Swiss-Prot record:
Family of the protein in this entry: Belongs to the peptidase A8 family.
The protein's role, per its UniProt record: This protein specifically catalyzes the removal of signal peptides from prolipoproteins.
Protein name: Lipoprotein signal peptidase
EC number(s) from the headed UniProt entry: 3.4.23.36
Lineage, opening ranks: Bacteria, Pseudomonadati, Pseudomonadota, Alphaproteobacteria, Rickettsiales
Keyword list, A-Z: Aspartyl protease, Cell inner membrane, Cell membrane, Hydrolase, Membrane, Protease, Transmembrane, Transmembrane helix
Length: 170
């Protein structure tokens, strides 16, 4: 139960930080335009109607399609979140859900996701992203690492028989 509370806090915190960071970036951009923060990082303004890296943004009705897809993914993740028995996985899913909700809120309010962080080195420019994208990416990576670690130690011989395996919960 405690992990569920921490997971819900993660959802709310990530969502709130994402929305605040976007509001700040929108305000900053409207006053100052694109701004180099570090030699490799700039504040920019990109309205992304597609998915990762702007893919499929030119599709007719892309916002409607991706809004429904986002809702479906968030609902699926929330079901997994509620059913999860692993504290660490619950927190990872909370971070992912919070980020996904942040981007969904943009789609519903603006018709596109607001991206404002641009990483670059010389002529190389990584596609713009936002705080929610970072949280979704980090949450998924942490969740996958936990799954790999869990499955690596999940099968334990309890009887001395190499064919007799049982699942060990951590």
């Amino acid at each position: 139960m405690k992990s569920k509370i921490v997971g819900v806090i993660a959802i709310v915190l990530v969502f709130a930080l994402d929305q605040v960071s976007k509001a700040y970036a929108i305000d900053w951009y409207s006053q100052s335009g694109a701004t180099e923060i570090f030699k490799f990082c700039s504040l920019v303004e990109v309205w992304n109607r597609g998915i990762s890296f702007g893919m499929f943004g030119a599709l007719e009705s892309s916002n409607l399609i991706f809004t429904y897809v986002s809702l479906g993914v968030i609902l699926m993740l929330f079901v997994l979140f509620v059913q999860s028995k692993c504290n660490k996985s619950t927190i990872c899913m909370g971070v992912v859900i919070g980020g996904a909700l942040g981007n969904l809120a943009d789609r519903l309010r603006f018709g596109a996701v607001y991206d404002f962080i641009s990483l670059h080195a010389g002529e190389f420019h990584w596609p713009a992203f936002n705080f929610a994208d970072v949280c979704v990416t980090c949450g998924v990576i942490c969740f996958l690492c936990l799954e790999v670690m869990y499955h690596a130690k999940a099968c334990v011989d309890t009887s001395g028989d190499p064919d007799a395996l049982s699942v060990k919960k951590y």
